[in-house]
Amino acid sequence: MLILFFVVWGADSLGFFMFGYSTVVFEALAFPLLFAGTFVSLCLSFYLVAKSHKAVLEQVSDPPKLVDSDVYAWVRHPMYLGTLLFCLAFLFISVSLVSIAIWIAFFIFYDRMATYEEKNLIEILGEQYTAYQKRLSKWLPGV
């Protein structure tokens, strides 16, 4: 999926730089806002992915237990959120309608994958995971 995103993003961005066409969205946004969005998205994505891998790998146990510390105390799917934020950074760079559509498709894909995984986690962890679901948002901290 990530390869598909970069292929579409690259082709879309290439059209802007080579042929000079643009979208209304690109013309409406200022460079500082785009730069800030890119920077924040990239930093958050690297942080979330690194911290979530560390939290999970340090707490591997048999039988399985719920990891609800570190970034898993903020959102239920920090690895997926990190990947989505990484793609969002490239969306800020290209700011095209095609990139926005691809990012939305990515979000839907990751949301469905997370929902499927949560069904399996409920089977494995039971009430412990359903209580975790009630405490935390799937994607956004505090929501």
Residue ranges and their predicted role:
Residues 1-68, 85-143:
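Membrane-anchoring alpha-helices and their flanking helix-loop junctions
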Residues 73-84:
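Membrane-interface loop-to-helix entry segments
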